[in-house]
Structure formats: structure tokens, C-alpha cells
Amino acid sequence: MISYYFQGFALGVAMILPLGPQNAFVMNQGIRRQYHLMIALLCALSDLVLISAGIFGGSALLMQSPWLLALVTWGGVAFLLWYGFGALKTAMSSNLELASAEVMKQGRWKIIATMLAVTWLNPHVYLDTFVVLGSLGGQLAMEPKRWFALGTISASFLWFFGLALLAAWLAPRLRTAKAQRIINILVGVVMWLIAFQLAREGVAHMHALFN
């Protein structure tokens, strides 16, 4: 059964490595050393719920509900555009230190709300957990399925805590005005690229619904 664990772990690592809203948010919180371990835990727990739902039957709900998928997609597009705009606005600020200080004033609950939005309004999360993992893990018998899910969930916990701790460790180098500007530009551009990609997929999906 251990082979199914490592299959799930490898697939989980492959899906979580690319820079996305979750990774960018965890990295930024780590650099700020602001609730970064709490955010890593909440991201990993969210993945635990989504991965379990996808592998143990939730994929059927999403695949049978095209309007739900469309709603999630366009909600994600709107959020990613807003999130990317915020990052670019901070990067282009004439007083980057003041802009960064304003971000640091955010309370715990606002940070948690942003993390939940970054996770649960990202359609790629549902495609990864419900469609990819659901189609692969859903075909397994119950015992191998549990090991497969455990491997994928382990990858998520290891990655988010590792990213948060590494970013916090590198914080002295990454907190400089130049580094912060580069990071915010990179995050903003990536968020907008993902949003435009999702918008294209959303248009194609809506076209299929009405034809």
C-alpha cells in the first residue's frame, strides 16, 4: 500500500509547485512573518478537505453541475484580477515602505478571509482536486484510495509549512524595497495571467453551455 502513498505524494507535489494565489500568499506572509504558520496550517487543512472530497466522491458533483463550475470560474477571475491589482498597486507605490506598512496593519481575521478567498475562489484548486485527483484516486479500491489521499495531503502539509518557514528565514533579504517591488510585480503579473487564462476557459465553457 505504501506505493499508493508515494504516488499520491508525487502527484500532490507536481500540482502544488507552480506559483499560484495560494503559494504567493503564503510566501508573502512568510516574508512578513505575519501569522505565516497559521496561514500555512489553514491552507493545508483546506487542501485536506478539498482532496478528500475530490478523491472520495465530490468530483461527480462538480462534473454534473456545469453552472456551478461556471460560477466558481468567474468568481475566481474577479478575485484574481483584484488580488493582482493590489500587488501591482503596492509595487508601483512611490513610497513602497509606507505601502508595505499599511499591509502589515491588516488584522488576523482579514488575513484569514483573504487566505480563504485565495483558496476557495481559485477554480484551479477544484480542477486539481476534484477532476485530476478525483479521476485518478476515485478508481482505486477503498484501502489504496486512503493511502493515495494520505500521500497527497502529506505533500500539501509539507509544502505549505516548508514554504512559510523558508520565506520567513529569507525575510531579511526579501524585505528590501527592491525585492518587495520585484515580488509584488511578479505576483501581480502571474495573478492576471491566471485570471485571463481562466476567463478564456470560462468563455469556452459558457459557449458550450449555450450551444
Curated annotation (Swiss-Prot):
Membrane topology (UniProt): Multi-pass membrane protein
Role description: Involved in the export of arginine. Important to control the intracellular level of arginine and the correct balance between arginine and lysine.
Localization of this protein: Cell inner membrane
Family the UniProt entry places it in: Belongs to the LysE/ArgO transporter (TC 2.A.75) family.
UniProt cross-references to Pfam families, sorted A to Z: LysE
Any one Gene Ontology cellular component term annotated for this protein: plasma membrane
GO molecular function: L-arginine transmembrane transporter activity
Protein keywords: Amino-acid transport, Cell inner membrane, Cell membrane, Membrane, Transmembrane, Transmembrane helix, Transport
Highest classification ranks of the organism: Bacteria, Pseudomonadati, Pseudomonadota, Gammaproteobacteria, Enterobacterales
NCBIfam families registered for this protein in UniProt: 2a75, PRK09304.1
Organism this protein belongs to: Salmonella paratyphi A (strain AKU_12601)
The protein's name in its UniProt record: Arginine exporter protein ArgO
InterPro entries named among the record's database cross-references: Arg_export_ArgO_enterobac (IPR023445), LeuE-type (IPR001123), Lys/arg_exporter (IPR004777)
Domain of life where this protein originates: Bacteria
Keyword Glycoprotein: no
Gene that encodes the chain: argO
Transmembrane segments: 1-21, 37-57, 68-88, 111-131, 147-167, 179-199
Catalytic activity: L-arginine(in) = L-arginine(out)
